């Protein structure tokens, strides 16, 4: 019998602040930005809020929402890829305000028509993340309207002027200042902000930023990571949380990866339990499994969706995935130990892995178990270009890898032990899940993997209209309007 792993127990406590910083890191990678972009934006936003005379409670909202502003980016990455081809470079062009970034949208009905559904996904997911982390309701509200503008041309609800939460204006301006100053220099950045006065955000905030921006940016460049942490944390972000939400946000980037990180974590913990009674080791490998895919956000979806061998340029991006996971741990406090272990997920005993090309003795037992678990879960999962391997075929593949000296034989047998049953963390919110019928859960699982209503109908032998009815019922019962949030909630309830 395999153990049930609780990420809340036995670790260095994971604060909400640590989780928020990890999610900020993922968001920055998704947007093609430096990995301190969201933290710097948060600091600038807090200074702007204080200088503008905004009350202390709203200043805390600014701090929390600014770091989670891009937390919905993995959820709509597939949509950006469908429109632009490369979901990351297109976002860089958007943030930098390049005049040509909207050209592909004109033939598709215009900016609003194309971006409205993508903004809806992003805002609903980031708001849901704030709710799941226990942050203030005002933070959730700000994130659900993070792309609204002063002139009413924002998204998703086209709010305007005083109906837009004030933190949205502050965060939007601070984010623009951070990007523009870094890209074009301070003087031009202030000119670009002035052009957006009373369209994107109120003139009074632009005027305040213009007075202080040069000194703020100079001060910001001199701050240590500890200084940034002290300036950005709030009382709600001191609460304890677990790493499962990070795993779920990671996996939203590619619908066919839904549940992958949790499955790797559970498989690794179960395999570890077969090799050592050390419960601390079980928990370490479990948390590492949850976050091992953080760096995946740095690679465009069109690379991940390639059915054939990757060209060298794409392969180089993939090889850096565990590096970015390791870097996230340096920024995210209590996740440091887990990220160090997680960054070994793709190493191999013969030195053919990445990113370190580590060998033999350099790889701990936990690293070997994690590597075998990633391979096992990947083989047993369907991909757009292939069906899932059968248990026997996947087991043979793992044993062949061990025989060739790439994977550890003991780790492989531990992962395959007892029919490779995996542990599952006790789900939360089961009362919500109990309201869904068995057929609704079937439909929910299918749409969480990215299946269209037509594909779900074929898979479950239902009519498209029946599937649509089930989807509408699922959304109503889960109180959401997007598949991404339905997936987050279903995963938290243990339904996937």
Predicted regions and their residues:
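Short, locally clustered residues in the helix-turn-helix/winged-helix DNA-binding domain
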Residues: 251, 445-449, 491
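DNA-binding alpha-helical recognition surfaces that contact promoter or target DNA
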Residues: 191, 207-208, 396, 445, ...
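Conserved acidic segment of CheY-like receiver
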Residues: 436-437, 447
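Recognition helix of helix-turn-helix DNA-binding domains
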Residues: 450-485, 489
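Histidine- and acidic-residue-rich, metal-dependent catalytic cores
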Residues: 2-435
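Intrinsically disordered, low-complexity basic tails/linkers immediately adjacent to helix-turn-helix/homeobox/MYB/SANT
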Residues: 489-496
């Amino acid at each position: 019998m395999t153990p049930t792993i609780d990420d809340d127990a036995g670790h260095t406590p994971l604060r909400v602040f640590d989780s928020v910083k990890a999610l900020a890191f993922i968001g920055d990678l998704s947007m093609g930005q430096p990995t301190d972009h969201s933290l710097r934006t948060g600091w600038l936003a807090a200074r702007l809020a204080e200088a503008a005379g905004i009350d202390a409670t709203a200043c805390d909202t600014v701090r929390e929402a600014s770091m989670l502003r891009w937390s919905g980016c993995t959820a709509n990455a597939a949509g950006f890829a469908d429109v632009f081809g490369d979901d990351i470079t297109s976002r860089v062009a958007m943030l930098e305000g390049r005049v040509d970034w909207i050209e592909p949208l004109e033939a598709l009905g215009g900016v609003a028509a194309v971006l409205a559904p993508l903004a809806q996904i992003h805002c609903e997911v980031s708001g849901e993340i704030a709710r799941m982390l226990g942050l203030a309701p005002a933070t959730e509200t700000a994130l659900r309207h993070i792309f609204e503008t002063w002139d009413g041309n924002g998204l998703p609800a086209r709010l305007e002027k005083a109906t837009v939460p004030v933190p949205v204006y502050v965060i939007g301006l601070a984010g623009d200042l951070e990007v523009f100053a870094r890209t074009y220099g301070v003087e031009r950045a202030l000119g670009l902000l002035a052009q957006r006065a009373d369209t994107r955000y109120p003139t009074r905030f632009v005027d305040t930023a213009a007075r202080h921006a040069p000194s703020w940016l100079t001060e910001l460049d001199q701050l240590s990571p500890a200084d940034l942490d002290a300036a950005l944390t709030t009382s709600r972000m001191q609460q304890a949380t677990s790493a499962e939400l990070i795993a779920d946000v990671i996996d939203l980037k590619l619908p066919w990866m839904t549940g992958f990180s949790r499955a790797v974590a559970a498989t690794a913990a179960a395999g570890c339990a077969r090799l050592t009674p050390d419960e601390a080791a079980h928990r370490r490998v479990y948390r590492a499994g949850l976050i091992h895919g953080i760096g995946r956000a740095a690679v465009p979806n069109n690379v991940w969706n390639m059915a054939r061998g990757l060209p060298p340029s794409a392969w180089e991006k993939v090889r850096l995935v565990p590096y970015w996971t390791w870097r996230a741990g340096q920024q995210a406090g209590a996740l440091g130990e887990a990220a160090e272990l997680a960054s070994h997920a793709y190493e191999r005993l013969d030195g053919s892995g990445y990113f370190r090309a580590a060998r033999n003795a350099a790889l701990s037992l936990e690293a070997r178990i994690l590597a075998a678990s990633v391979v096992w879960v990947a083989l047993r999962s369907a991909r757009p270009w292939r069906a899932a391997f059968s248990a026997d075929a996947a087991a043979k593949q793992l044993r062949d890898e061990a025989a060739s000296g790439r994977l550890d034989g003991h780790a492989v047998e531990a992962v395959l032990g007892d029919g490779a049953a995996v542990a599952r963390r006790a789900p939360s919110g089961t009362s919500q899940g109990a309201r869904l019928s068995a057929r609704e859960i079937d439909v929910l699982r299918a749409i969480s993997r990215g299946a269209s209503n037509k594909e779900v109908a074929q898979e479950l032998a239902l009519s498209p209209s029946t599937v649509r009815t089930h989807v509408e019922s699922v959304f109503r019962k889960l109180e959401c309007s997007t598949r991404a949030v339905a997936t987050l909630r279903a995963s938290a309830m243990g339904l996937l």
